[in-house]
Amino acid sequence: LHSTSRRQRQMCIRDSSTSRWAEALRELSGRLEEMPAEEGFPAYLASKLSAFYERAGMMQNLNGTEGSVSIIGAVSPQGGDFSEPVTQNTKRFVRCFWGLDKALAYARHFPAIHWLTSYSEYLEDLTPWYRDHVSPKFVADRNQLMAILNQESSLMEIVKLIGSDVLPDDQKLTLEIARVIRLGFLQQNAFHQEDTCVPMEKQFEMMEIILYLYEKSKALINRGMPVSVLKEDNIFERIISIKYDVPNNQLDKFEQYRK
């Protein structure tokens, strides 16, 4: 790691399974007849995990250069139980968590990272970078999309009980826009030339178009137009397809969707 940072490189290390390592640590601890802690894991599990993750970060080298090491650790708790010791201690020492969701994987929604269980504590640190390198509105747009997804989660509890037909049109619109966010923005096709790697500028333009559709649709609903009429010209499906239809090097085409 140190030789990599001295050569002024940015390196990422992926740990395939912290859980298996912790289980091996538990077995060795048992054979050494050490005092077990929660669920049989050794009492020093937390310190071992912290010693590993604390090796990540930016390096100020003696030769005046800079390098960095990023660590991504995979935790596989038994039965998806996030309360077990390995998961809990890992979350103590990291500031970002990607929660993989089995239902999303079965639905072929990749990456199968659930947007409500996942989080990043780096958002505040990165806000100046987004403001200077992408747009001052980037974080605000991101927060608005997350608010819509949270509203969808609350509304889905009602939909499961009594169906979506009984919802008022403004709430139906929220569900429709959330679907656009999930399929048109979050879902990714790694085998598609335009979608396999999307620049930040395009991601921002996609968020802007989705929110533009939301505001214009909400204005029409406030004037009495039902959501069913808005859906007749497949405008929502067209917005879902912009990730494929707009090339990564032709972002000026987004203006066509504002007309």
Per-range role (PLM):
Residues 1-9, 13:
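Single conserved hydrophobic/aromatic residue that forms the stacking wall/gate
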Residues 17:
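Walker B catalytic acidic pair
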Residues 20, 27-259:
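Conserved catalytic/coupling modules of large nucleotide/cofactor-utilizing molecular machines
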